[in-house]
């Protein structure tokens, strides 16, 4: 009987942690237009440009950021998620100053959020928090200081970036492999998920998935 009860408890625990997944499609959006259901904004100055495009290398429409701003930002409307995940496929196309793609979570607004980004010029993946418009890198669990993790980020290739966030603990996965975990309590409330680039990065996004932990 005890074994059965333990098994039931474990099953309930697993079910409680199931994530309700939503997938984003740009098929209904016009090519060259901003995607519906998202708010295009920025942290800092500049003119970001988010458009839906048809990419010959992808079977469906994709999203492109080709403007220039301090940090171009695209927030998903009607997402208030405290614990959950966001996952993307991205392709870094161009950029002299930067060539980056990032995912955002728990965003209060354009100046307050978490982001983890991959950079094809630096070949690394780095977690940050942006507080009142000021960005600072986060320490990785088990290591004090440093600047993210070195990782090959080849340009013009589709790559996967994912973050899972529960409470103050964040787990970052790149190309399907866990890179690191982060512990931070700056933003503990639910917020929006989103997409992010930096400076003159020209970046493509596809297969955007997100969800909340039930």
Regions found by a protein language model. Name each.
Residues 187-214:
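Ligand-recognition surfaces built from glycine- and aromatic
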Residues 168, 173-194:
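Short, solvent-exposed beta-strand-to-loop segments that form ligand-recognition rims
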Residues 6-15:
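Bacterial N-terminal signal peptides
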Residues 33-62, 68-70:
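Extracellular glycan-recognition surfaces and repeat-rich motifs
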Residues 134-162:
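Short, aromatic/His-centered strand-loop micro-motif at the edge of beta-sheets
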Residues 26, 88, 163, 206-210:
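Extracellular beta-strand elements of beta-rich domains used
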Residues 16-22:
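Boundary at the C-terminal end of the N-terminal hydrophobic targeting segment
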Residues 31, 65-135:
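Secretory/extracellular carbohydrate-interaction modules
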């Amino acid at each position: 009987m005890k074994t059965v009860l333990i098994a039931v408890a474990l099953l309930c625990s697993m079910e409680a942690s199931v994530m309700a997944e939503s997938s984003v499609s740009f098929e209904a959006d016009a090519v060259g237009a901003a995607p519906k259901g998202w708010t295009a904004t920025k942290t800092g100055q500049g003119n970001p440009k988010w458009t839906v495009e048809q990419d010959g290398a992808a079977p469906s429409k994709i999203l492109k950021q080709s403007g220039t701003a301090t940090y171009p930002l695209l927030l998903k409307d009607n997402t208030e998620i405290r614990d959950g995940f966001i996952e993307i496929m991205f392709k870094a196309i161009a950029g002299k100053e930067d060539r980056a793609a990032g995912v955002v979570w728990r965003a209060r607004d354009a100046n307050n959020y978490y982001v983890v980004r991959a950079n094809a010029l630096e070949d690394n993946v780095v977690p940050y928090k942006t507080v009142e418009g000021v960005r600072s890198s986060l320490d990785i669990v088990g290591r004090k200081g440093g600047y993210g993790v070195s990782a090959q980020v080849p340009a013009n290739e589709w790559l996967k970036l994912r973050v899972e966030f529960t409470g103050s603990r964040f787990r970052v996965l790149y190309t399907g492999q866990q890179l690191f975990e982060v512990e931070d309590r700056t933003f503990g409330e639910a917020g929006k998920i989103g997409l992010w680039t930096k400076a003159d990065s020209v970046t493509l996004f596809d297969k955007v998935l997100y969800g909340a932990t039930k």
